[in-house]
Amino acid sequence: MLLVSKLLTLFVYPLSFFFTLVIVSIVLRRRLASRLANALRLLAVAWLYFCATEWGASLLLAPLERGYPAVETDALPLAEAIVVLGGGMTDESRFGLGGDLNAAADRLWHSAALFSAGKAPIMVLSGGAGLGQSTTEAELMLGALRAIGIDGAIELETQSQTTRENAYFTGKLLNAHGITHILLVTSAAHMRRAIPLFQAQGLLVTPAATDHQTPLHVGAIPGWLPTTERLGRSTRALHEWVGYWIYERLGYFEMAAITEN
């Protein structure tokens, strides 16, 4: 099911959608539907261009992040636990020193700062092993935190492979400890989907958003020029919008339990 859902999600990504429309237009052209084929090609090019510009990337991503601004560590309340969602590491490493960090590694550093500041007495690292991975992301995150000197009570949730499972399995762990109030650490764009899933587990959630990707300033490259970085942000935003829509339609924000294999 995980593989199927990820493959289906790929079709909404700008590049995948572009090539899908191009392939459909080629088929239509061979069937003498040239006018429709040309329209699809124009739509494909326009959509890819839009998503690769600052206009498109900001229009798609900013609404996801706007509700979860960066908050100074001192301004966040005390909680019973800090919950960190996986997504910032992979188990690939060229040097045999553990997982490699990726673009979402801010989750790890932000959680380390919160824990060091005493915002909660316990931290929960949530993330199982992805497709083709031999080590769970929770274990990789623990290794990275220990390497930078973060000690103390850290619990691991190693079964989850989706955001929904993050919430469910972490919720079970927290309920066993009698914990109800958490600081949730994940990327700002991910918060819209993650928070209601944890609330469905009966938890009081305070967002501790990080990894904001909407730039404060456009920079040297004009906003109308397409770049791969902007295309990447649009892709991330579409992933979250579609994920939120699917979870909402399936009732995941209201359902506390899932079927365990």
Where in this protein do the model-derived segments appear?
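Membrane-embedded alpha-helical segments of integral membrane proteins
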Residues: 1-27
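Hydrophobic alpha-helical segments of integral membrane proteins
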Residues: 3-8, 56, 60-64, 238-245
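Alpha-helical transmembrane anchor segments
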Residues: 12-17, 204, 231, 244
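Membrane-interface helix-boundary motifs at transmembrane edges
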Residues: 29-37
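A structural signal for short, hydrophobic/glycine-enriched beta-strand patches
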Residues: 50-228, 234-235
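Extracytoplasmic/luminal low-complexity segments enriched in Pro/Gly and acidic/polar residues
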Residues: 220-221, 232-261
